């Protein structure tokens, strides 16, 4: 019998498949879309993600970056926090996904072009997409059909505006070896170096408007990028997605499907890869229910810092002070940057 049936062939699902294969489990990935899969993503791997991917034998191409720079979108005031434990890596989503899929295939993971929607489980096994396995790992993204089908999606918080992400690539040489986060009154723009001649720009916002209209809120950045757009715009959202639990019988959730706060801290991939390892460890030990607490402990810092930043972002008097405060307290800002690496 299959040990792990993984629903979803994105980074979280593939990291789980690799962890499982390295632990000696029989793993099958059900993913209806062909590789590589492109999605809206900030495309910045924090140092922790780079280290963990290397430990899995995954070699990812990209452009290193040394830290994070906050920039006031109007005045240009900036604050910098450098990583203390090695560089991060700007890598296109398609390159990352291809590298993960290649490593999984090398380890004997089987890929089937199937979509998982309905799930049936008993005390001994779970059945989905015509397959039976000991466990199902739902790594099917932000709007997880498995989570929704099992009635495990938590309702959105009232009076809290939904936020969305928009991403586009530009054929511009990176002007910095840092990921820049530009702050405007209502949105943030993330500039990630991806190659010697390419950067990615991801805008996070509560306003539903076209990418160029969003970018206009950052005049210095918009002027610098004018005429260099190289790819269509990709979008994602609403970003905040609640999950009632991470373990439901023989179904376990990982990555965005396990619940997501916001992309503000850029820590989603690190958490996904780390949680994938904990999930496999718990399953292999015969204690899948222990994964719930493991996930909560792993994600605690990410959730706390992200919620704190969002709380400040939503307050008109506090939001304009985020960058000046970071510039005034460089050691505190650097500590916060390194809290999540």
Positions of PLM-derived features:
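Redox-cofactor binding/interface segments in oxidoreductases and associated redox assembly factors
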Residues: 7, 138-139, 253
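C-terminal helical "tail/cap" subdomain of flavin- and related membrane-associated enzymes
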Residues: 281-341
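A conserved beta-strand/loop capping segment in the N-terminal third of enzymes
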Residues: 49-99
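Short phosphate-binding/catalytic loops that engage adenosine nucleotides
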Residues: 25, 58, 109
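N-terminal Rossmann-fold NAD(P) dinucleotide-binding loop
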Residues: 13-14
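Predominantly flavin-linked oxidoreductase catalytic cores and closely associated redox partners
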Residues: 103-227, 243
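Glycine-rich FAD pyrophosphate-binding loop
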Residues: 5-9, 18-41
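FAD/FMN-dependent oxidoreductases across multiple families
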Residues: 118, 207-282
């Amino acid at each position: 019998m299959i040990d792990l049936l993984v629903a979803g062939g994105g980074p979280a699902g593939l990291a789980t498949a690799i962890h499982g294969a390295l632990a000696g489990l029989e793993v099958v990935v059900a993913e209806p879309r062909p590789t590589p899969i492109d999605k809206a993503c900030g495309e910045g791997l924090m140092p922790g993600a780079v280290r963990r991917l290397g430990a899995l034998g995954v070699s990812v191409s990209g452009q290193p970056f040394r830290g994070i720079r906050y920039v006031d979108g109007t005045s240009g005031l900036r604050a910098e926090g450098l990583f203390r434990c090695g560089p991060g890596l700007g890598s296109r989503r398609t390159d990352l996904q291809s590298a993960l899929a290649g490593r999984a295939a090398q380890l004997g993971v089987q890929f089937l072009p199937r979509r998982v929607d309905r799930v049936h489980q008993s005390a001994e096994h779970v059945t989905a997409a015509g397959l039976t396995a000991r466990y199902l790992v739902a790594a099917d993204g932000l709007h997880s059909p498995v989570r929704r089908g099992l009635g495990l999606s938590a309702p959105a918080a009232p009076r809290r505006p939904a936020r969305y992400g928009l991403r586009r690539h530009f054929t511009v040489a990176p002007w910095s070896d840092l990921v820049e986060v530009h702050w405007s009154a209502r949105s943030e723009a993330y500039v990630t170096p991806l190659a010697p001649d390419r950067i990615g720009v991801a805008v996070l916002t509560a306003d539903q408007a076209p990418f160029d209209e969003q970018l206009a809120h950052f005049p210095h950045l918009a002027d610098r990028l004018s005429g260099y757009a190289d790819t269509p715009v990709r979008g994602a959202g609403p970003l905040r997605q609640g999950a009632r639990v991470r373990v439901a019988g023989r179904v376990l959730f990982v990555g965005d499907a396990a619940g997501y706060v916001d992309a503000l801290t850029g820590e989603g991939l690190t958490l996904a890869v780390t949680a994938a390892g904990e999930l496999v460890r718990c399953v292999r030990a015969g204690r899948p229910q222990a994964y719930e607490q493991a996930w909560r402990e792993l994600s605690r810092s990410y959730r706390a810092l992200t919620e704190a930043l969002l709380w400040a972002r939503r307050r008109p008097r506090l939001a304009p002070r985020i960058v000046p405060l970071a510039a005034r307290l460089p050691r505190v800002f650097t500590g916060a940057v390194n809290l999540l690496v």
